[in-house]
Amino acid sequence: AFKNLMPLLGMGGETEKGIALPILPWWNAVAINDVPAQSDFYSSANGRLLNDLVRDAREPEKVALLQKVWRQRLSYRLVRSAEESKIALSSVAETRASLPFISDELATLISQQGLESALNQPLARILEQVQLALDNAQEKPDVIYLTGGSARSPLIKKALAEQLPGIPIA
Protein backbone atom coordinates (compact mmCIF):
# COMPACT_ATOMS: atom_id res chain seq x y z
CA ALA A 1 0.00 0.00 0.00
CA PHE A 2 2.71 2.43 1.01
CA LYS A 3 5.06 2.15 -1.97
CA ASN A 4 2.54 1.53 -4.75
CA LEU A 5 -0.68 3.28 -3.76
CA MET A 6 0.29 6.23 -1.59
CA PRO A 7 2.00 8.15 -4.44
CA LEU A 8 -1.50 8.38 -5.98
CA LEU A 9 -2.48 10.29 -2.84
CA GLY A 10 0.41 12.74 -3.02
CA MET A 11 3.16 10.91 -1.16
CA GLY A 12 6.57 12.01 -2.41
CA GLY A 13 5.19 15.37 -3.48
CA GLU A 14 6.48 18.84 -2.76
CA THR A 15 5.16 22.17 -1.61
CA GLU A 16 4.89 25.07 -4.05
CA LYS A 17 8.30 26.17 -2.67
CA GLY A 18 9.90 22.83 -3.59
CA ILE A 19 10.09 21.44 -0.04
CA ALA A 20 9.37 17.71 0.27
CA LEU A 21 6.09 16.85 1.97
CA PRO A 22 6.51 14.86 5.20
CA ILE A 23 6.07 11.10 4.72
CA LEU A 24 4.60 10.31 8.16
CA PRO A 25 0.92 11.07 7.37
CA TRP A 26 1.02 8.62 4.44
CA TRP A 27 2.80 5.98 6.50
CA ASN A 28 0.39 6.30 9.41
CA ALA A 29 -2.58 6.05 7.04
CA VAL A 30 -1.63 2.50 6.02
CA ALA A 31 -0.16 1.30 9.32
CA ILE A 32 -3.46 -0.37 10.24
CA ASN A 33 -1.87 -2.80 12.71
CA ASP A 34 -0.17 0.02 14.63
CA VAL A 35 -2.69 1.54 17.05
CA PRO A 36 -0.56 4.62 17.89
CA ALA A 37 0.01 5.30 14.17
CA GLN A 38 -3.71 5.04 13.45
CA SER A 39 -4.53 7.24 16.45
CA ASP A 40 -2.06 9.80 15.16
CA PHE A 41 -3.40 9.62 11.61
CA TYR A 42 -7.01 10.10 12.70
CA SER A 43 -6.22 12.83 15.26
CA SER A 44 -7.55 16.35 14.85
CA ALA A 45 -3.94 17.60 14.83
CA ASN A 46 -3.28 15.47 11.75
CA GLY A 47 -6.47 16.80 10.19
CA ARG A 48 -5.07 20.32 10.58
CA LEU A 49 -1.74 19.16 9.13
CA LEU A 50 -3.53 17.67 6.12
CA ASN A 51 -5.38 20.97 5.60
CA ASP A 52 -2.01 22.74 5.59
CA LEU A 53 -0.51 20.18 3.21
CA VAL A 54 -3.41 20.55 0.77
CA ARG A 55 -3.01 24.33 0.92
CA ASP A 56 0.77 24.25 0.35
CA ALA A 57 1.20 21.26 -1.99
CA ARG A 58 2.27 21.60 -5.60
CA GLU A 59 -0.39 18.95 -6.39
CA PRO A 60 -3.13 19.72 -3.85
CA GLU A 61 -5.67 17.51 -5.61
CA LYS A 62 -3.57 14.43 -4.77
CA VAL A 63 -3.07 15.37 -1.11
CA ALA A 64 -6.81 16.06 -0.90
CA LEU A 65 -7.30 12.34 -1.60
CA LEU A 66 -5.29 11.49 1.53
CA GLN A 67 -7.44 14.01 3.35
CA LYS A 68 -10.52 12.10 2.13
CA VAL A 69 -9.02 8.87 3.54
CA TRP A 70 -8.68 10.73 6.86
CA ARG A 71 -12.17 12.26 6.77
CA GLN A 72 -13.96 9.05 5.81
CA ARG A 73 -11.69 6.67 7.75
CA LEU A 74 -10.72 4.65 4.69
CA SER A 75 -7.35 3.27 5.84
CA TYR A 76 -8.54 -0.30 6.17
CA ARG A 77 -10.17 -0.28 2.72
CA LEU A 78 -6.99 1.17 1.21
CA VAL A 79 -4.82 -1.53 2.77
CA ARG A 80 -7.35 -4.20 1.79
CA SER A 81 -7.10 -3.08 -1.85
CA ALA A 82 -3.32 -3.38 -1.65
CA GLU A 83 -3.68 -6.86 -0.14
CA GLU A 84 -6.04 -7.93 -2.94
CA SER A 85 -3.47 -6.72 -5.47
CA LYS A 86 -0.73 -8.65 -3.70
CA ILE A 87 -2.86 -11.80 -3.80
CA ALA A 88 -3.55 -11.29 -7.51
CA LEU A 89 0.18 -10.91 -8.17
CA SER A 90 0.78 -14.40 -6.83
CA SER A 91 -0.73 -15.70 -10.09
CA VAL A 92 -0.33 -12.87 -12.66
CA ALA A 93 2.58 -10.63 -13.66
CA GLU A 94 0.61 -7.39 -13.37
CA THR A 95 -2.67 -6.24 -11.84
CA ARG A 96 -4.71 -3.05 -11.71
CA ALA A 97 -5.34 -1.65 -8.24
CA SER A 98 -8.48 0.48 -8.32
CA LEU A 99 -9.53 2.77 -5.49
CA PRO A 100 -13.06 3.91 -6.47
CA PHE A 101 -13.96 4.45 -2.80
CA ILE A 102 -11.47 7.35 -2.84
CA SER A 103 -12.01 8.61 -6.41
CA ASP A 104 -13.83 7.02 -9.35
CA GLU A 105 -10.86 6.93 -11.73
CA LEU A 106 -8.09 6.41 -9.15
CA ALA A 107 -6.08 3.33 -10.14
CA THR A 108 -2.58 2.14 -10.91
CA LEU A 109 -0.90 -0.90 -12.39
CA ILE A 110 1.20 -2.93 -9.98
CA SER A 111 3.68 -5.51 -11.24
CA GLN A 112 5.33 -8.47 -9.55
CA GLN A 113 8.61 -6.60 -10.00
CA GLY A 114 7.17 -3.52 -8.26
CA LEU A 115 5.87 -5.68 -5.43
CA GLU A 116 9.24 -7.38 -5.13
CA SER A 117 10.94 -4.00 -4.85
CA ALA A 118 8.45 -2.83 -2.20
CA LEU A 119 8.92 -6.03 -0.18
CA ASN A 120 12.74 -6.16 -0.24
CA GLN A 121 13.20 -4.59 3.19
CA PRO A 122 10.39 -6.48 5.00
CA LEU A 123 11.54 -9.73 3.37
CA ALA A 124 15.09 -9.13 4.59
CA ARG A 125 13.72 -8.73 8.14
CA ILE A 126 11.76 -11.98 7.82
CA LEU A 127 14.87 -13.82 6.67
CA GLU A 128 16.86 -12.33 9.57
CA GLN A 129 14.27 -13.71 12.00
CA VAL A 130 14.39 -17.11 10.30
CA GLN A 131 18.18 -17.12 10.62
CA LEU A 132 17.93 -16.10 14.28
CA ALA A 133 15.51 -18.99 14.94
CA LEU A 134 17.84 -21.40 13.14
CA ASP A 135 20.83 -20.16 15.13
CA ASN A 136 18.92 -20.52 18.41
CA ALA A 137 17.62 -23.99 17.56
CA GLN A 138 20.99 -25.13 16.22
CA GLU A 139 19.28 -27.46 13.78
CA LYS A 140 17.27 -27.22 10.59
CA PRO A 141 13.55 -27.94 10.38
CA ASP A 142 12.14 -30.97 8.59
CA VAL A 143 9.48 -28.84 6.90
CA ILE A 144 8.47 -25.15 6.76
CA TYR A 145 4.79 -24.33 7.25
CA LEU A 146 3.60 -20.98 5.91
CA THR A 147 0.31 -19.61 7.15
CA GLY A 148 -1.83 -16.58 6.42
CA GLY A 149 -1.09 -14.35 3.45
CA SER A 150 2.53 -15.48 3.35
CA ALA A 151 1.41 -18.96 2.32
CA ARG A 152 0.44 -17.58 -1.09
CA SER A 153 3.48 -15.36 -1.60
CA PRO A 154 5.86 -16.72 -4.22
CA LEU A 155 8.45 -14.16 -3.07
CA ILE A 156 8.53 -15.51 0.47
CA LYS A 157 8.53 -19.13 -0.71
CA LYS A 158 11.42 -18.43 -3.09
CA ALA A 159 13.45 -16.59 -0.43
CA LEU A 160 12.93 -19.37 2.13
CA ALA A 161 13.81 -22.04 -0.44
CA GLU A 162 17.07 -20.17 -1.15
CA GLN A 163 17.85 -19.79 2.56
CA LEU A 164 16.93 -23.40 3.41
CA PRO A 165 17.52 -25.49 0.28
CA GLY A 166 16.09 -28.98 0.27
CA ILE A 167 13.56 -28.33 3.05
CA PRO A 168 9.94 -28.72 1.87
CA ILE A 169 7.69 -25.67 2.18
CA ALA A 170 4.07 -26.48 2.97
Tell me what each language-model feature is.
Residues 67-75, 104-134:
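Adenine-nucleotide phosphate-binding core of ATP-dependent small-molecule kinases
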Residues 31, 52, 124, 128, ...:
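Localized chelating/binding microdomains
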Residues 92, 100, 147-149, 170:
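Generic beta-strand/beta-sheet core signal
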Residues 1-101:
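Phosphate-binding glycine-rich/basic clefts of nucleotide- and phosphate-handling proteins
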Residues 81, 85-88, 117-144, 156-159:
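Phosphate/ATP-binding catalytic cores across multiple sugar-kinase/actin-like superfamilies
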Residues 105, 149-155:
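Flexible loop/turn segments at secondary-structure boundaries
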Residues 16-20, 29, 133, 137-149:
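Short glycine-rich phosphate-binding loop at a beta-alpha junction
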Residues 157-170:
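Conserved phosphate-binding/catalytic loops in two-lobed NTP-binding clefts
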